[in-house]
Amino acid sequence: MVGHLHLQGMEDSLKEQGREGLLDSPDSGLPPSPSPSPPFYSLAPGILDARAGGAGASSEPPGPSEARAPPSQLPNPPASEMRPRMLPVFFGESIKVNPEPTHEIRCNSEVKYASEKHFQDKVFYAPVPTVTAYSETIVAAPNCTWRNYRSQLTLEPRPRALRFRSTTIIFPKHARSTFRTTLHCSLGRPSRWFTASVQLQLCQDPAPSLLGPATL
């Protein structure tokens, strides 16, 4: 049984050895030439024998009784460990607000019209804490046990009027004299209250007789 071995990079060297063999034959009439040293890329004898045996075995077809060896199956790589995914399912938060005011605020408001002045004095305001702004952020990273949430609650004492008493002073629409009622009230300082009374009467004189303002 003869096998054929094909090696890459050695075809040229085999052709040169064949030519040298023809020159070394006794019919050529030339002295034999020394055999060249094997090339540095020549394979080891064990590798050549193994390849020659494999090539010879491949030339013969396998018998019917011989079973083909199953191809080698590579082991499956280990599946990457899947971490549990964190998703916000339920989130609850309780907020407790104490509505009791710490102190009262007293102020006076003044409304001006074309021919009258309207005062609202003794107005009591209580700072009731009410929710004016609320924001919430929940961050749940996938495949991670890290969670972060932030809640921001803004409370402002929005004043609400509890009780007040109004006083209305009406002047004539075409009054020629100026009557003024002044009301001063400042927090933390002694307050002064001024009240003016105006009495009007009908007369024949074009210039109406007016009584001066009386300070009570």
UniProtKB/Swiss-Prot annotation:
PTM sites of type Asymmetric dimethylarginine: R163
Biased composition (Low complexity): 57-71
InterPro entries noted in UniProt: Refilin
Subcellular location: Cytoplasm, Cytoskeleton
An annotated Gene Ontology molecular function: filamin binding
General function of this protein: Involved in the regulation of the perinuclear actin network and nuclear shape through interaction with filamins. Plays an essential role in actin cytoskeleton formation in developing cartilaginous cells.
Protein name: Refilin-A
Domain of life where this protein originates: Eukaryota
Assigned protein family: Belongs to the Refilin family.
Region (Disordered): 1-83
Main localisation: cytoplasm
GO terms, biological process: actin filament bundle organization; negative regulation of bone mineralization involved in bone maturation; negative regulation of chondrocyte development; skeletal system morphogenesis
